[in-house]
Regions:
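Surface-exposed, low-complexity/disordered Ser/Thr/Gly/Pro/Asn-rich loops and linkers
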Residues: 44-54
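Accessory beta-strand-rich segments of carbohydrate-active enzymes
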Residues: 3-5, 9-18, 30-38, 53, ...
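Short Gly/aromatic-enriched secondary-structure transition segments
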Residues: 21-29
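Short amphipathic alpha-helical segments, especially helix-boundary/capping motifs
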Residues: 39-43
């Protein structure tokens, strides 16, 4: 018998450039939709507004939320987290323990997270690194002029 928990819905979103401020964000979803809904940016699809939101691609981002795990779920030999369309460089933590690293939006990831879970309340965080900044770091490490 299989069991699953759906973690889609409202999460908290925080930028590396903000102190303690968070905004609500839906997953599946994206940063720009959350920023627009929170009134933090103009509509990037209107006029030349895209130019006004370029800075946000250089931020690191963190999605987080709490979720409950029924004790029965921990009776299974394995408890897997499946992540799809994670764009792009991200680390997933459950209760502060790293359970998954992602580097490719087009890869489906699966990790056994049972050891990180506890019955009752749990916290999951997805920490995204700026793809632009990570690409620049990788390019600088290449042996080419």
């Amino acid at each position: 018998m299989a069991c699953s928990l759906d973690l889609s819905g409202v999460w908290s979103l925080k930028s590396s450039e903000w102190k303690e401020e968070t905004i609500p964000a839906n997953l599946p979803g994206d940063n720009y939709s959350a920023l627009l809904a929170a009134g933090k940016i103009p509509d990037p699809h209107y006029g030349r507004n895209e130019l006004a939101v370029q800075e946000f691609r250089r931020h690191d981002w963190e999605y987080s939320r709490d979720f409950d795990v029924p004790a029965e779920l921990l009776g299974y030999e394995h408890v897997y987290l499946t992540a799809e369309m994670v764009d792009t460089f991200a680390t997933v933590l459950i209760n502060g323990k790293k359970v998954l690293s992602c580097e490719n939006m087009f890869t489906r990831y699966r990790a056994d997270v049972k050891a990180a879970l506890r019955a009752g309340s749990n916290r999951i965080e997805i920490r995204f690194k700026s793809a632009e900044n990570e690409a620049k770091k990788a390019a600088a490490e290449q042996p080419f002029p």
